[in-house]
Amino acid sequence: MHTTTTLPTTSPAEREEEALVPEGLYGPPQWLDDRGISALVAPYLCEGWDLGDYARFAELSGTDARRLASLLPKKARDDRQNNAPRIIDLLRAASRVDGLTLEGYVIRAPRRDERVSIDTVLVPESAIVAHTGSPIDEERYPSYQHWLTLASVLGLGEDAIPPDEMRVLIRDGSSTRWWWAWWD
């Protein structure tokens, strides 16, 4: 009788060493650095909010949003910050809707929950008007209908959960009005 023995591809010492390095929430330790995500997000980090393993970012949009979507591991694309839409859906919206910007934060190694999360969306009123054909009805704002309009602009389904806060704001001293939505 002939027996075949299959040898493991790694030695017991290598397997033991791998066991000592716990897999993170969406990948191995340092996956943000290894995939180039830290470098991509670096120009968007908010001054005073880079606190080591936690850093806030703002103004992410367009090409960089598209690039971030391509760099995220498959598991991380479904991340939802406190019932916000999936990160991949928000990144696609920022890639598609002119002027739409995203805010959120990165959690860095050595934390096991290393990730990128998006908790805020800013949509210029011009994108809303292009979609609806009319400006914001401020007397009734924000209403559930406004959320449905925003969800439609973002390309979300009807099952998307509304933000915890939503308002119209003017920023950077310009006259541009923005729809601001935040999931806490």
Residue ranges and their predicted role:
Residues 1-136:
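Long, contiguous N-terminal structural blocks used for assembly/anchoring
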Residues 24, 42, 140, 171-176:
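Intrinsically disordered, low-complexity regions enriched in Ser/Pro/Gly/Gln/His and often acidic
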Residues 29, 47, 145, 176-181:
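Short, low-complexity intrinsically disordered segments
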Residues 133-156:
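Short amphipathic alpha-helices in soluble, non-transmembrane regions
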Residues 149-184:
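Acidic, proline/glycine-rich low-complexity IDRs
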